[in-house]
Design a protein with these regions (language model features):
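Helicase motor core with emphasis on the C-terminal RecA-like subdomain
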Residues: 3-14, 18-22, 26-48, 55-58, ...
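Conserved catalytic helix of short-chain dehydrogenase/reductases
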Residues: 70
């Protein structure tokens, strides 16, 4: 089994970093030892490193289950730029494109396949899956499997069926959002062989939080952005609203663009 020194060599070779951050190395060592593992890490905590590094140290293909198409495409592009073979299956692909992608995962020596949970139940995927050499399963946004969570997605329940097809393959579940109930539920629904949780602090010491009560949110937003130097991120509750805010800001001579999971 690879040691942490080997993992650090991989980190240095592909990402240029000399050391891991926070609980990254603990998670990597755990999944590298074949243990089912749950990692609780804040956004920006470096979740992708926790499965990409050990997957590169293992023989075979890492199956990455995520609901976010934009994230799939972004991570696949980033991996390819580093010379790492990665593929994704998402909505909008033709049946032939999906078949070719799955065949490449069987015969093409690829290291990562990103797929949405909705695709896990298809007959073609399950047939091809059993011919793949799967090294580990990564479940991103794993709180979506819990009915106690705020963003429950029934398709995530199919992951337990995939585990039955691959009983000896370890699973790494990752999330930035989980109450104690959700933590227990994630492990139960993913059929963890034993409880195994790593937690990273969610405190952001470089951030200050200010709450402003206003009856004119748009006016307040414009007031803040006109006064503030540099760049800013504006979070919106849905895709439509991201586009509306972008249009509003551009009309007010504030250069802006939108980004969402679609």
């Amino acid at each position: 089994m690879p040691t942490s020194i080997t993992y650090k060599d991989i980190l240095k070779q592909y990402w240029g970093y000399d050391a891991f951050r926070g609980i990254q190395e603990d998670i990597i060592n755990s999944i590298g030892e074949g243990k089912d593992t749950l990692g609780l890490m804040p956004t920006g905590g470096g979740k992708s490193i926790t499965f990409q590094v050990p997957a590169l140290a293992k023989e075979g293909l890492c199956l990455v289950i995520t609901p976010l198409i934009a994230l799939m495409k972004d991570q696949v592009q980033n991996l390819k730029r580093r010379g790492i073979k990665a593929l994704a299956i998402y909505s909008g692909m033709s049946r032939q494109e999906i078949i070719v992608t799955l065949e490449n995962c069987i015969f093409g020596n690829y290291k990562f396949l990103y797929i949405s949970p909705e695709r896990l139940g298809t007959e073609i995927f399950r047939t091809k899956l059993q011919k793949m050499n799967i090294s580990m399963i990564t479940v991103d946004e794993s709180h979506c499997i819990s009915q106690w969570g705020y963003d429950f997605r029934p398709a995530y329940l199919k992951i337990a069926e995939i585990r039955e097809l691959l009983p000896n393959v370890p699973v790494l579940a990752l999330t930035a959002t989980a109450t104690p109930e959700v933590v227990r539920d994630i492990q139960a629904r993913l059929n963890f062989r034993e409880e195994n949780v790593f937690r990273m602090s969610f405190e952001r010491q470089n951030l200050a939080y200010i709450v402003r009560n206003t009856e004119n949110k748009t006016g307040e937003l414009l007031h803040i952005l006109h006064k503030m130097p540099g760049s800013a991120i504006v979070y919106a509750r849905n895709r439509r609203r991201t586009k509306e805010i972008t249009e509003l800001l551009n009309n007010e001579s504030i250069t802006a663009d939108f980004y969402h999971a679609g």
